[in-house]
A protein has these predicted regions:
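Non-heme di-metal
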Residues: 1-225
Length: 225
């Protein structure tokens, strides 16, 4: 518990300094600076990240030899897959959100990930698969926390712009709660090894998570302008 508290102080400080909720993408969205087509394109690009996220978890699990440390991640992966209910698979709930803001099934099917999103997906896969699991795991913890922090903002903006009913916003209402839980579960696993030389590796992983995800938001913003 002591190491977890110490690690949480590091992540809390990081989020105080970076203030991801004030990223220019969310400021511009909140200020209504985008056309409907631009909003839809940004939402579609995030879809390609949501679609890919379970593969990051799968990649990192291959590098973890201790089943006890794998268990929280397996549960996370189980929830990503809707606890085996296809209706609640996270990529499917996100598709419901897309439809709620006026994106058609045809537009979803024809959408392609942009170069920034491909770079993000490949970069994180590489980190999770080919480097020490503590580094990748720390990055995923930060990413889960970022999503938990921005989900209420996105949900509120969607309600304001589209009057979306709660049903189509389930992806974001779920992630407000689930991703806080997932982030803390990941931090708890990482904290078990937060000592000695591994501290530096873990802190580098935290920074990677913040860098990759905030950079992805920046690149998506630049792409639609």
């Amino acid at each position: 518990m002591e190491k977890f508290v110490e690690l949480k102080k590091v992540t809390d400080r990081m989020f105080q300094e970076k203030k991801i909720e004030q990223h220019p993408l969310f400021v511009a969205l909140n200020n209504g600076e985008f056309s409907e087509e631009q909003r839809k394109e940004m939402a579609l690009q995030i879809y390609h990240v949501v679609l890919y996220f379970p593969r990051f978890l799968s990649a990192i699990l291959t590098n973890m030899s201790d089943y006890r440390m794998r268990m929280p991640l397996v549960e996370n992966l189980f929830e990503e897959h809707g606890k085996m209910n296809e209706k609640y698979v996270h990529s499917e709930t996100y598709k419901e959100f897309l439809k709620g803001i006026g994106v058609s099934e045809k537009e979803i099917m024809e959408s392609e990930p942009s170069i920034p999103v491909i770079a993000y997906n490949r970069g994180l896969t590489d980190l999770c698969l080919h480097y020490h699991y503590l580094e990748g795991l720390a990055a995923l913890g930060v990413i889960e926390e970022i999503v938990a922090r921005v989900s209420p903002l996105v949900g509120q903006i969607a309600k304001s712009n589209y009057g979306s009913e709660n049903k189509s916003l389930i992806h974001f209402t779920d992630h407000e709660v689930l991703d806080v839980q997932h982030a803390n579960e990941i931090y708890e696993v990482v904290a078990l090894n937060y000592e000695g030389d591994q501290k530096q590796m873990i802190e580098r992983g935290l920074q990677f998570g913040m860098y990759y995800h905030s950079r992805m938001y920046t690149d998506i913003l630049e792409n639609v302008h």
